[in-house]
Amino acid sequence: MEGQMQHVVLKLKNLLNIEKDIYFEIFNIEEEKSEAIIKKSGKVIEELSVSQERLLNKIESLEKERIKLMEEYSKHRNVLHHGNEITLQDIIDTVDAKSSSALKLAGIELKKILLKVKNIQDVNSQLLKDNMEFYDILISGLKNSSTLRSGYGRDGKEKGRVFNPVLFNIKA
């Protein structure tokens, strides 16, 4: 039984490290997105988002596995946990010093990369918001510079003409 639980702890540590590596890839994609946002390259942003979505699907699968491992460990070791779900700290508190140190380090490194990802996502969100505001202002200015003049010709038909017309591609 003890060997089986050590195996679960080792598997959990490896899982955390795999998640950390995937989040590092996500961080790199977010950095590329920053450049694409600045260059206003929608196609690149879309391609990066598709890649990122695949990685997030992997993370979701790993998270399910991690929760399952933690619950299995908790059940076999009668781990007391605070709240409804078992935390990594709950497991760290019950394992030997070497395993505790390894799990704690894996958890800390995962948390560091998660914070980096969150920070760069916040920056990218602000960049996108700023770009949208810029385009809203630009479009408003262009709309205001377009006018419609109309009158009637000798034949009684209305003649309408737009001066300074602005054409928009609604699919863009």
Q: Can you say where each PLM-predicted feature lies in the sequence?
A:
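Extended, charge-rich alpha-helical scaffolding segments
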Residues: 2-93
